[in-house]
Amino acid sequence: MNWLNNVVRPKIRSILKRETPENLWIKCPDSGQLVFYKDVEANQFVIPGSNYHMRMGATARLKSIFDNETWFDVALPDVAADPLKFRDERRYADRIKDARAKTGMNDAVKVGYGRIESTPAVVAVQDFDFMGGSLGMAAGEAIVTGLQLAVEKHAPFIMFAASGGARMQEGILSLMQMPRTTVAIQLLREAGLPYIVVLTNPTTGGVTASYAMLGDVQLAEPGALIGFAGARVIEQTIREKLPEGFQRAEYLKEHGMVDMVVHRHEMRPTLARLCRLLMKVPAPHADEVAAPPPPDVEGPPPAAEPVALPPA
């Protein structure tokens, strides 16, 4: 190595270290166009032009729904992380650890309490990035806790569903969450409070046989895949070709399974109107929307601050 290499090498090394971030560009699954990630993020993860709705994380979803992007992060009960000591190709405990590192969440469901255009509401969001949004003990406990809080606060409960189904690594303990959440929804109904479901892409498996299809009002995002079994499984079983768009939000709306297909940019005002209608609350004046709550009503602190539920 001569003296020239000694001079040039550090610069070359610094150039090699300049790596392009993996998520700098996003390819639209619908149109194939490349879009700058920050533009998609600023557009609530809707691809400009094609209007394709990308998957949205739980925190980003809550920010897009609540007034001033603030809410209570509801503290959730601890559950056994790996009750069956399950192992397939990898240990289930390791899969949980990786999912937590990837998403920053403890499990697949995040619950927040705040205001939507000045109307108090409890919102639960499934994050598909956490093991496919699968329903396990922790996710079931989060939904039940959110429903209990809605009854306590006399507020509507909104569920954003996104899941591949029950979490098989937890066996019967996972399947048990289907009747548990159903019973909790019934308690909400007995309290005279609305239950609104937003079906996002994808919502499949066991969740569609329980809480995801029990809403007083069923909304869906455009193009969302919604169904119990996969299309290929159904075709192989019935030995027939399925109709165009089968199991998509628009098809389900045409056949009465979904009440409304709502663009993500219209989701917040739509939910606010539904909450006011079902709770029989008058619409606020324009200057009151996203304004601080009255002194006698406790408003939501910043999202990072958790709040513990009182004992039952």
From Swiss-Prot:
<keyword id="KW-0963">Cytoplasm</keyword>
<comment type="pathway">
    <text>Lipid metabolism; malonyl-CoA biosynthesis; malonyl-CoA from acetyl-CoA: step 1/1.</text>
</comment>
<dbReference type="GO" id="GO:0005524">
    <property type="term" value="F:ATP binding"/>
</dbReference>
<feature type="domain" description="CoA carboxyltransferase N-terminal">
    <location>
        <begin position="24"/>
        <end position="293"/>
    </location>
</feature>
<dbReference type="GO" id="GO:0006633">
    <property type="term" value="P:fatty acid biosynthetic process"/>
</dbReference>
<keyword id="KW-0067">ATP-binding</keyword>
<keyword id="KW-0276">Fatty acid metabolism</keyword>
<dbReference type="GO" id="GO:0016743">
    <property type="term" value="F:carboxyl- or carbamoyltransferase activity"/>
</dbReference>
<keyword id="KW-0444">Lipid biosynthesis</keyword>
<dbReference type="InterPro" id="IPR034733">
    <property type="entry name" value="AcCoA_carboxyl_beta"/>
</dbReference>
<comment type="similarity">
    <text>Belongs to the AccD/PCCB family.</text>
</comment>
<dbReference type="InterPro" id="IPR011762">
    <property type="entry name" value="COA_CT_N"/>
</dbReference>
<dbReference type="GO" id="GO:2001295">
    <property type="term" value="P:malonyl-CoA biosynthetic process"/>
</dbReference>
<dbReference type="GO" id="GO:0009329">
    <property type="term" value="C:acetate CoA-transferase complex"/>
</dbReference>
<comment type="subunit">
    <text>Acetyl-CoA carboxylase is a heterohexamer composed of biotin carboxyl carrier protein (AccB), biotin carboxylase (AccC) and two subunits each of ACCase subunit alpha (AccA) and ACCase subunit beta (AccD).</text>
</comment>
<keyword id="KW-0547">Nucleotide-binding</keyword>
<feature type="region of interest" description="Disordered">
    <location>
        <begin position="286"/>
        <end position="312"/>
    </location>
</feature>
<dbReference type="InterPro" id="IPR000438">
    <property type="entry name" value="Acetyl_CoA_COase_Trfase_b_su"/>
</dbReference>
<keyword id="KW-0808">Transferase</keyword>
<feature type="compositionally biased region" description="Pro residues">
    <location>
        <begin position="291"/>
        <end position="312"/>
    </location>
</feature>
<dbReference type="Pfam" id="PF01039">
    <property type="entry name" value="Carboxyl_trans"/>
</dbReference>
<protein>
    <recommendedName>
        <fullName>Acetyl-coenzyme A carboxylase carboxyl transferase subunit beta</fullName>
        <ecNumber>2.1.3.15</ecNumber>
    </recommendedName>
</protein>
<keyword id="KW-0443">Lipid metabolism</keyword>
<dbReference type="InterPro" id="IPR029045">
    <property type="entry name" value="ClpP/crotonase-like_dom_sf"/>
</dbReference>
<dbReference type="GO" id="GO:0003989">
    <property type="term" value="F:acetyl-CoA carboxylase activity"/>
</dbReference>
<keyword id="KW-0275">Fatty acid biosynthesis</keyword>
<comment type="function">
    <text>Component of the acetyl coenzyme A carboxylase (ACC) complex. Biotin carboxylase (BC) catalyzes the carboxylation of biotin on its carrier protein (BCCP) and then the CO(2) group is transferred by the transcarboxylase to acetyl-CoA to form malonyl-CoA.</text>
</comment>
